């Protein structure tokens, strides 16, 4: 069974820096587990790792799609599985890093996402029908067929709502039930980063301000001008600008909304990982010494003794 290390947790807790340190110490390559970092030219709002920050560590599933492309959990799972095999064959450690919980669960627990052509044709027909409905109607359908998913889903994420309904209609099984019956396909270790909520929220607010200083408004305007419909336009940090660009919100209201949505997303990320996956949690923000504990945990899992200082 191939080994896979995953670094998970909410936004703004230091996953990127830790993953690069770990990759350097344990001969790893990094696979992005973020649903937005696949998109080219969306660098600021996705907090995409820079070439300098990579420090020569190979990174995968970054800048592989245009903003007009769809990128689903099924696409991620299929591509990441191939990457894991290739990285393992090179004698390196695959390290999946990100906060998109469903993508990671689909990969590590082999969730059935409708991979056959027949399934995909059926999904397309269902999706066409569902796309004609208003959000309130979709939520009502989801509440009827899968209350557990309804209670935890992001009400603003139309794509995820439709996906949850599709799963039920194609498989006859609730998404929430499917996620409760995981099948391990890798020898995986999940390292989770988190910190005290007030500190986390301060870091999120600060990160949004840094994104604004780096040019987030211009990046979002470019995306808005390019197209009004793609999946990429639905991400946090981008979707909030639409009313501002239509002169329906002020700049300060838009910034406040991005910060609010980001905080809510972080809360949902934590809930997901705590409820759906077996994660080993650490707080390296308040307790930097815990990073050494993470290295020890990885060493024990790998069954090797790795020199921490090289």
From Swiss-Prot:
The keyword Transferase applies. The record marks 100 as: Interaction with substrate tRNA. Its EC number is 2.5.1.75. It catalyses: adenosine(37) in tRNA + dimethylallyl diphosphate = N(6)-dimethylallyladenosine(37) in tRNA + diphosphate. Its cofactor is Mg(2+). Substrate binds at residues 11-16. Monomer. This is tRNA dimethylallyltransferase. It comes from Pediococcus pentosaceus (strain ATCC 25745 / CCUG 21536 / LMG 10740 / 183-1w). The lineage of its organism: Bacteria, Bacillati, Bacillota, Bacilli, Lactobacillales.
């Amino acid at each position: 069974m191939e080994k896979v290390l995953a670094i998970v947790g909410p936004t703004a807790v230091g996953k990127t820096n830790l993953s690069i340190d770990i990759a350097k110490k344990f001969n790893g390559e990094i696979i992005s587990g973020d649903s937005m970092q696949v998109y080219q030219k969306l660098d600021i709002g996705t907090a995409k790792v820079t070439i300098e920050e990579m420090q020569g560590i190979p990174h995968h599933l970054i800048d592989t799609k245009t903003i007009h492309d769809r990128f689903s959990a099924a696409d991620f799972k299929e591509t990441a599985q191939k990457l894991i095999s290739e990285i393992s064959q090179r004698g390196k450690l695959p390290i999946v890093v990100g906060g998109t919980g469903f993508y990671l669960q689909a990969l590590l627990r082999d969730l059935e996402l409708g991979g056959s052509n027949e399934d995909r044709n059926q999904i397309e027909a269902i999706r066409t029908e569902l796309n004609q409905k208003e959000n309130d109607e979709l939520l009502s359908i989801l509440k009827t067929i899968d209350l557990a998913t309804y209670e935890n889903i992001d009400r603003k994420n139309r794509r995820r709502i439709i996906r949850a309904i599709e799963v039920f209609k194609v498989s006859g099984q609730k998404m929430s039930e499917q996620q409760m019956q995981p099948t391990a396909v890798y020898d995986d270790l999940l390292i989770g980063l988190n910190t005290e909520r007030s500190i986390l929220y301060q870091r999120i607010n600060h990160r949004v301000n840094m994104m604004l200083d780096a040019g987030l408004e211009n990046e979002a305007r470019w995306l808005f001008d390019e197209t009004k419909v793609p999946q990429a336009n639905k991400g946090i940090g981008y979707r909030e600008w639409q009313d501002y660009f239509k002169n329906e919100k002020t700049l300060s209201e838009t910034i406040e909304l991005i910060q609010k949505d980001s905080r809510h997303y972080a809360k949902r990320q934590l809930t997901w990982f705590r409820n759906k996956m077996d994660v080993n949690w650490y707080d390296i923000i308040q307790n930097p010494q815990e990073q050494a504990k993470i290295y020890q945990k990885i060493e024990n899992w790998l069954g090797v003794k790795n020199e921490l200082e090289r």
